[in-house]
Amino acid sequence: TCISYGGSQSIVEPKNASQVVLDLLEDIGVDLKRFTTAYDIGFFKRHGMGGVTYFNEEIFGEDKLVQHPYCNYPNYVEGLLGGRLSHEEAAAQAPLSKKGRKQLLRVLNGGLHALDVQEADLQDYINSHSYFDYLQKTLGVDDPGVLRMARHSGLDWGSFSAELMSIAQAKSCGAMGFPPKAVYDEDNPYIYHFPDGNAGVARALVKKLISGVAEGRNAEALVLARFNYAELDRPGNPVRLRLNSTVVNVKHGGDPASASEALVTYINDNKSFQVRGRNVVMACYNMMIPHLVSDLPEKQAAALRSQTKSPFVYTTVGLRNWHAMKDSGIGVAMSPGNMHQAVLMDFPVSMGGYKFTESPDKPCVIQM
C-alpha cells in the first residue's frame, strides 16, 4: 500500500505556532515529537539521492541530467543531499552556449556582494529592486537559457514568476544565484508530515468530534484506520458532518448588531436547505467569504477580497519501482522548461503501521 497526499502538505513551523494551535494539536492527538523519528532523515543519504537538474531537448537542445540544482528550492526536503558538483563544474555541464555558461557561472557566484550599494541602504535597495533587473543590469545576463533557469528557480514560493520578485524575495526563497541556506530554521525542520499530508490532521479533528467514526486513540493510530462515513451525520451525534452539501449563503437572522442566530443556506442533491445556528464559523477559503456572507462590514469584505492564491498543480505518480530515481541520484529534480518544473520522491515518513518504501525494488510515490 502506498499513501500520499492530495492537498495541504505538512505542518509548517509548529514551534512558531500560537499556544492555541499547539493546544488544539495536542487535544486531537497530534504528537509533534513523534515526527523526529517518523521522518527518516537518513533516507536520501543512504540511497545517494540529492538535488539535480533535468534539461529537456525541446528547450535546451539535449536531454541531460546535471548533478546540481542551480537553486535552493530542493533544500526544503530534510535530509536531501546537495549538488555533487561545484558551481564551476555545474556551469560547464549546463547545455548552454559558451556565453550562456559564462553568464550562468557569474550568476552562481553572485549575491548581495555583487551590488554596488552602501550597507546602510542595502535593505531598502533589495526590497525595491527586482531580481531580474539584478540579473540583467547588475550581472549582464541576456542568455535566454540562463534567464529561463532563473525564472523557474523560484517555483512555488509566490503567486508570481521570479521575474516579478524583488531581490529580497529571491534571496529569501533561494532563487538561482543566492547561496543555499536553511529555508526553515533548525527548530522547525520540514518533517511534520503525515503520510497523507494534513489530511492526517483533518481526520484527527473529525475523530475528536465524532468518536465513532474510526478506531484509534490518537492521530498516528488513524493513519491506516478506515473511516465509517455512516457515522458522520447520525441524528444522535452532538456534532454532525453533512457531505456533498455546498453552502451558498450565510447571513444574520436580523440586524447583524443584535441578531441572536445565523441562517445558513446550502445545496444538497440539487435541493436548497436552510439551517439556523447560534454561531457560524466560516472555515473556508477566505476570499470566498464576501460572496457567501452578504451582510459583512464593507471594510472587512474588502480585506478578505484582497487575498490571492496562485495556480498550483501537483501530480502524484505511483511507480512500480524507483531504480531510475536511485540510479540517477534524483531526490528532487528541477526541470526548467517542462510543464512540471520539479520531480521529487515523496517524504520518507513511516508511522501508524505504514512503512515508507525502503528498497528501489518496491513501489513508491513521486510528486511532480
Give the residues covered by each predicted segment.
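Active-site/ligand-binding neighborhood in enzyme catalytic cores
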Residues: 95-245, 253-260
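N-terminal glycine-rich phosphate/pyrophosphate-binding loop and immediately adjacent elements
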Residues: 1-113, 119-120
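Conserved beta-strand->loop/alpha-helix structural units within folded catalytic cores of enzymes
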Residues: 17-18, 33-36, 128-131, 138-140, ...
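A generic secondary-structure signal for well-formed alpha-helical elements
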Residues: 25-33, 112, 138-143, 209-216, ...
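Residues that flank catalytic or metal-binding motifs in active/ligand-binding sites
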Residues: 7, 48-49, 237, 243-246, ...
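Active-site rim elements
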Residues: 4-15, 117-124, 187-196, 300-308
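C-terminal segments that line or cap access tunnels to active or ligand-binding sites in enzymes
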Residues: 186-193, 251, 260-279, 284-368
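Short, solvent-exposed loop/turn and secondary-structure capping segments
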Residues: 22-24, 65, 148-149, 162-164, ...
